[in-house]
């Protein structure tokens, strides 16, 4: 095993200019991540300098067998924490051979919204709190739970420490460092209310980069759980009953919200979000109705409510923002399995471009 480990950790730059690029794209479910690697002649830092590639879309549920080729366009580059050296991870989006975005390519439309002059001028910042659950392989039951049974009730686990409270910290910490190495603006981690559930935060990130960074952070987490022999779940309510669900709270601000007088702009933006509540809920993740029940720090899915420091609201404004008269707000509705390209661009569209 030590030889295998040595080979995995070989530093290619000692002997060759060539690098390995791992191309990542979103599969047919809209949540599954796929990837494959290719050799390039030397280091690359600009995605536009990378070659397009293709894959068999009939094997990912994205194209018919008789016309199976899907083309992937490189969009963002990150350092590869697994191969290290000059090797890279490449976030791509997917198109037909004719150049049309395929249905699961939500990045294409998001990029249009983020490149609109009115949106560019507002410089939208995002901070996404990605919750997830670690499951025991083969039994699909949370890490640290007795198989077929339950741990003690919620209370001691949130931000807890100790072998009876925190399960999977090695995975969480490995992911944290790997994201920092990759160049992702990961801003923190914490244990969540339900045992076996954790959270990491990405941001502040501007515009389309929030989606790119969150997707690659998810990919890195998938790879680390693969190594650890643990299953990663983004199910918004993995366990029925008196257990917290998993969300992807999205913190948001624009330039005018961050400037003096921004609190009035925030209130106006929240009012617009309330008017499009149903459209946002429809786009905020599968199975969210199991999570947004009005219990376990959520608002009811059919009700739009905002408040200061209220974790039972759809939109929460922090005490610091209220006091300063400017800042940001948190959209607490997105589920853990949401597509960040959809959520971030929709918030920008509703608050900046949409005229009620």
Curated annotation (Swiss-Prot):
Subcellular location, record wording: Cytoplasm
GO biological process, one term: glutamine biosynthetic process
Catalysis: reaction(s): L-glutamate + NH4(+) + ATP = L-glutamine + ADP + phosphate + H(+)
Major localization listed first in the record, in broad terms: cytoplasm
Enzyme Commission number(s): 6.3.1.2
Region of interest (Disordered), ranges: 41-66
UniProt KW keywords: ATP-binding, Cytoplasm, Ligase, Nitrogen fixation, Nucleotide-binding
Statement: the UniProt record of this protein carries the keyword Ligase: yes
GO annotations of cellular component type: cytoplasm
GO molecular function: ATP binding; glutamine synthetase activity
Domain GS beta-grasp, chain residue ranges per copy: 19-99
InterPro entries from the UniProt entry: Gln_synt_N, Gln_synt_N_sf, Gln_synth/guanido_kin_cat_dom, Gln_synth_cat_dom, Gln_synth_gly_rich_site, Gln_synth_N_conserv_site, Glutamine_Synthetase
Ranges of residues in domain GS catalytic: 106-356
A Pfam family of this chain: Gln-synt_C
Similarity remark: Belongs to the glutamine synthetase family.
Subunit structure: Homooctamer.
Protein name as it appears in the record: Glutamine synthetase nodule isozyme
């Amino acid at each position: 095993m030590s030889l295998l480990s040595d080979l995995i950790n070989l530093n290619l730059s000692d002997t060759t200019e060539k690098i390995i690029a791992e191309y990542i794209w979103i599969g047919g479910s809209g949540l599954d991540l796929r990837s494959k690697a290719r050799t390039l002649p030397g280091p690359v830092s600009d995605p536009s300098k990378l070659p397009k590639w293709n894959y068999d879309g009939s094997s990912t549920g994205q194209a018919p067998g008789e016309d199976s080729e899907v083309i992937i366009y490189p969009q963002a580059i990150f350092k590869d924490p697994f191969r290290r050296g000059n090797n890279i991870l490449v976030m791509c989006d997917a198109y037909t051979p004719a150049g049309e975005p395929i249905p699961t390519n939500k990045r294409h439309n998001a990029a249009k919204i983020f490149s609109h002059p009115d949106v560019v001028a507002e410089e939208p910042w995002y901070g996404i709190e990605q919750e997830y659950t670690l499951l025991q392989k083969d039994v699909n039951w949370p890490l640290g739970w007795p198989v077929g049974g339950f741990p003690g009730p919620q209370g001691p686990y949130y931000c807890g420490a100790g072998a009876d409270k925190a399960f999977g910290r090695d995975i969480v910490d490995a992911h944290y460092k790997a994201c920092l190495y990759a160049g992702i603006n990961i801003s923190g981690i914490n244990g969540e209310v339900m045992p076996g559930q954790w959270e990491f935060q990405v941001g502040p990130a501007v515009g389309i980069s929030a989606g790119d960074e969150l997707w690659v952070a998810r990919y890195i987490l998938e790879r680390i759980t693969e190594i650890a022999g643990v299953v990663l779940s983004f199910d918004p309510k993995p366990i029925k009953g008196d257990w917290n669900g998993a969300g992807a709270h999205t913190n948001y601000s624009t330039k005018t919200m961050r400037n003096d007088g921004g609190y009035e702009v925030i209130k106006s933006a929240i009012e617009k979000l309330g008017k499009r509540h149903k459209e946002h809920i429809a786009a905020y993740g599968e199975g969210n109705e199991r999570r947004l029940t009005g219990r376990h720090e959520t608002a009811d899915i059919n009700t739009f409510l905002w408040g200061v420091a209220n974790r039972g609201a759809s939109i929460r404004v922090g005490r610091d923002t209220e006091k300063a008269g400017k800042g940001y707000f948190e959209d607490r509705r997105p589920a853990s399995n949401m597509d960040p390209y959809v959520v971030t661009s929709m918030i920008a569209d509703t608050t900046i471009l949409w005229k009620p």
